[in-house]
Amino acid sequence: MLYTTALFPILLPVALHAQPCERLSQLASSTVSITLAKVVDAGNLTPAGSTNALPNLPPFCRVAADLKPTPDSDIHIEVWLPMAQWNGKFLAIGSGGWGGSLSYDEMADALRRGYATSATDDGHTGPSASFVVGHPEKLIDFAYRAEHEMTVEAKTLIRAFYGSDPRYSFWNGCSGGGREGLLQASRYPDEFDGIIAGDPANIRRNSWALELAVQTFRDPEAYIPPAKYPMIHRAVLEACDAKDGLKDGLIEAPERCNVDFKSLQCKASDGLDCLTARQVQTAQTITSPVATKTGKILFPRVEPGTELRWSRLAGGPQPADLFLDEFRYVVYQDPIGTGEASTLNATPPRRTQ
């Protein structure tokens, strides 16, 4: 007879620990510096550098550490260990964008649910990718090493504090954190029992090439104001809805649909019910594959049905720094020469039919 006990999480009423929280500071090594090891009482916590208080936290052992797997590394991590009712599990938290800070909100949520949890700044401070220039090891830290080193150190601290390894170890991250989760799975397949890789920003350079392709239009009149998005969306829905054999207000076969935006071009003066010739060109670029000068496809296209979310692509003359930083600092390693999208025109991505 098979019995299952998976209906409720097991909470371990940890009252006695293998060693006191403060003694975890003695676990330093040549590559690990423990900068904080103290018990935080139940209540609210406002981490240094943050203006947002984390409410309703249970008491926990808070450990902060600096990791230096290479001489040029500067990885900051925190590990939070419940003082009581640990559920026996470890949850590592991923970072978004270019990282540069710890995901305290997500750590707090995990702690409230009984997890031992950890997060890292990915080896640098701040949302920019400027840390990459002249520091190839820091780029490796950001890509995957910081997350791995954090996980190894977190498990070491868990073992020292509770006297046992976690029963299960999980990863949770979205966007950049999803990308990190996929890399941890491929490089360190035994590190986690489960990985939540939400909306992973994978092959990011290829997808972000579209951002630059749109920005090669220097004429401000090429940018489509958000007030026109509903009109464009209605036209796309009309053209694509029935491609799956059923007209039901849903686009379920976007791969079968190619919209001719010239049909929306203004016959006379500009208005909210039409596109200028330059705006037509922008719409065509957004919904066409982006390729190199040799014809290699970098990004297939933005699919029909996404028009109401075009603001990041068609809403201004400069791409967000998040995307521009990939080319400014990582590809070209030239923060001055590639400071504006227009200066990338020496080898711009192009649109293919």
Predicted features by range, described:
Residues L139, L183-A185, D190-A291:
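A catalytic-pocket lid/entrance helix-loop region that shapes and gates access to the active site
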Residues S101, G173-L183:
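Glycine-rich nucleophile elbow surrounding the catalytic serine of serine-hydrolase chemistry
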Residues H17-K89, I93, L102-D105, H233, ...:
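Catalytic-loop region of hydrolases
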Residues T120, N172-C174, A197-G198:
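Generic beta-strand/beta-sheet core signal
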Residues M1-L7, D199:
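Bacterial N-terminal signal peptides that target proteins for export
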Residues N87, A92-P166, A209-L210, F217-P220, ...:
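Cap/lid segment of the alpha/beta-hydrolase catalytic domain
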Residues S164-S175:
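Alpha/beta-hydrolase fold nucleophile elbow
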Residues L12-A15:
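N-terminal signal peptide c-region/cleavage motif recognized by signal peptidases
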